[in-house]
Amino acid sequence: MIPATCTLSQITARLGGEWRGEDISVTAVRPLADAQAEHISFLANPKYKAEVHDSSAGAIIVSAKAADGFEGRNLIVADDPYLYFAKVARLFSPVVKARGGIHPTAVVEPGATVPASCEIGANAYIGANTVLGEGCRILANAVVQHDCKLGDEVVLHPNAVVYYGCTLGRHVEIHSGAVIGADGFGLAFAGDSWFKIPQTGAVTLGDDVEIGSNTNIDRGAMSDTTVGNGTKIDNQVQIGHNCKIGSHTVIAAKTGISGSVTIGSYCIIGGGVGTVGHIEIADKTTIGGGTSVTHSITESGKHLAGIFPMSEHKEWARNAVYIHRLSEMNKRLKTLEQQLSDSKDTQ
C-alpha cells in the first residue's frame, strides 16, 4: 500500500520511469494549472508545454523528448506520460476492497451463494440460486436477480440492477442506475397491435468490464448479448439485444447501438453515435462523435465520422468545410446557370 505521501523514488520503484531533480514527497495528482508544491502533474500534449513553466507543481511527468526543455524541474520521465499519470493517480486512489458482511436490511434469497468476503449493502437484494465470487461489493439498493453468476471482486454501485440469468466476469464494475439484462425491444406486428417476443437470452460480460451510470444492456432474444474482456462503456449508453461487442473497446456517452450489431475489439466509439441494426464493425475502428453508422465497416482500422451520411474521416472533414458555404455556392450556381442561359439566347 503506497502511503498518503510518497517520494518520487518510491513512485518510480513501483511504476518504473526515471526521476530527475530532488526526491521530493508528493500527496496527489493535479492539473498543471492547479498543482501546488506538494502535487505531481503531467505533460502529455506538447501544446501545453508553456503551462509547465507557469505551473507550481512540485514534480511533473514528461516524456524523454520533453524533459530536455525543463532543466531544474523535478521530473519523472516516462514513455507514456498520460498512462503513467493514470497509474500514479491509482496509487493515490486505491481500489476499495469489500468489507465482508451482509447488512441487516439486505435480502439474500434461499439458494444464493454469498461468500463471507462479500459486502452486501443496505436494502440490497440477491436472488435465489445466484452465485457471487469472492470479494464482491453489492452496495445499497443494488439488485442481482435469480440465477446470476458474478465473478470475483465485482462491484455493483447503489441502485444498479442485474436481471435474472446474467453472467458477469471478474472485476466487473456497474455504476449507479445501470441495468444489465432488461428485455430487448423485440416485437411482432399482429395486424392491429404489437405482440411482444419473449427475450429468452441473457447478458454475458467478460472480465474487467466497466459500465457507466444509467447505461442499459438488453438481454438477447434467444442467445446472449455479450461484451468482451476489458471493454469500457460510458454513461447513458443503450446496447440493444443480441449485440456482440469485442474486447477492449470503448464507447462514449449517449451512444445507441441497435440490436444485433457486432462490434470488434479495440474499437473507439465517440459520444452520441447511432447505428442501424444488424451490421458489423471491424476491429480497431474509430467512429467520431455524433456519427450515424448506416452500414457495416468491414476493413479494420478505419477512422470514420459524419452526422449523415457516414464517410471516411478525411473526406468528412473536407466536406464539412463547404457545409457553411452551401447557401453562397447555391446562389453562385444559379447566377452561372442564368448567365449560361442568357448566353445561349443571344447566339
Curated annotation (Swiss-Prot):
Catalytic center residues: 241 (proton acceptor)
Documented EC number(s): 2.3.1.191
GO cellular component terms given for this protein: membrane
One Pfam family matching this protein: LpxD
Entry annotated with the keyword tRNA processing: no
Enzyme class: transferase
Record's keyword terms, sorted: Acyltransferase, Lipid A biosynthesis, Lipid biosynthesis, Lipid metabolism, Repeat, Transferase
Any one Gene Ontology BP term: lipid A biosynthetic process
Keyword flag Secreted: no
Pathway noted in the entry: Bacterial outer membrane biogenesis; LPS lipid A biosynthesis
GO function term, MF aspect, one: N-acyltransferase activity
Disulfide bonds: none
Reactions it catalyzes: a UDP-3-O-[(3R)-3-hydroxyacyl]-alpha-D-glucosamine + a (3R)-hydroxyacyl-[ACP] = a UDP-2-N,3-O-bis[(3R)-3-hydroxyacyl]-alpha-D-glucosamine + holo-[ACP] + H(+)
Assigned protein family: Belongs to the transferase hexapeptide repeat family. LpxD subfamily.
Known role: Catalyzes the N-acylation of UDP-3-O-acylglucosamine using 3-hydroxyacyl-ACP as the acyl donor. Is involved in the biosynthesis of lipid A, a phosphorylated glycolipid that anchors the lipopolysaccharide to the outer membrane of the cell.
NCBIfam families in UniProt: lipid_A_lpxD (TIGR01853), PRK00892.1 (NF002060)
Assembly information from the UniProt record: Homotrimer.
UniProt protein name: UDP-3-O-acylglucosamine N-acyltransferase
Organism: Neisseria gonorrhoeae (strain ATCC 700825 / FA 1090)
Gene that this polypeptide is encoded by: lpxD
